[in-house]
Amino acid sequence: MAAPKKVDLKAQFEAAAEAAKKTKKKPDNATLLKLYSYYKQATEGDVTGARPGGFDFVGGAKYDAWAKLKGMSADDAMTNYIKQVDRLNRE
């Protein structure tokens, strides 16, 4: 019986990803980093590769935010992403 729940979560995640693209208010940078890191963790798993260096401040911030989620399951990342988008759309 776990399979339908997983499919439902995936559908909710995909709907949230579409809703995030259509928000009327631009989120602040901290919220954008949370959305990015949860999305990447949900879709790709733990961060890999070297941290961007030099003057790539945005790349470094994205890498760091994603790296903080190391070990989080895809399901937990999807759930957190959905909650973050819901919160954003309520504002």
Q: Where are the predicted features?
A:
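A charge-rich, low-complexity, intrinsically flexible signal that marks solvent-exposed coils, linkers
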Residues: A2-G54, G59-E91
